[in-house]
Amino acid sequence: MRYYPARRSARSLRSTRSVRFPNDVVFLDHIRQGDLEQVGRFIRARKVTLDTIYLTGMGALHEAVLSGNLECVKLLVKYGADIEQRDENGWTPLHMACSDAHPHIARYLLSLGAQKDVVNTDGEKPCELIDSDCEELVQLFSTKEGD
């Protein structure tokens, strides 16, 4: 005896449900992935606002700094991201660049006038979050202190 499976139409094989994520979730994912084209599209289409503090407790620029992607940071700044925006713990993007050892991003933020003496809710300045092994950041802040 031979088994013949019931024929199913292509329509019944398609999922009847689809998952849709909120724009902010998709936007932050594009930032983390460094997908500059999609990040730009979201901003130009006004699907997101750059001053929002998301469920992660951070803004878009904070997320870009954490990803270590300077080009994404530059793109967000180009579209108006605030380089002094604070996350829920009072950290600025410069705090994050120093804490996560991204000297190229810290240098860029400082070149735009980011405040190096601003303190977070724990009273820490960005330079106090630098790992002493990150010589480039240590040197960057030691030369900036003399300015």
PLM regions with names:
Residues 1-27, 112, 119-147:
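Ankyrin-repeat-protein effector appendages
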Residues 38, 71-72, 104-105, 136-137:
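Conserved ankyrin/ankyrin-like repeat signature
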Residues 22, 55-56, 88-89, 121-122:
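Ankyrin repeat start-site detector
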Residues 43-48, 74-81, 107-114, 142-147:
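Ankyrin repeat domain, specifically the short helix-to-loop turn at the C-terminus of the second helix
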Residues 11-59:
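N-terminal segments that cap or nucleate solenoid repeat domains
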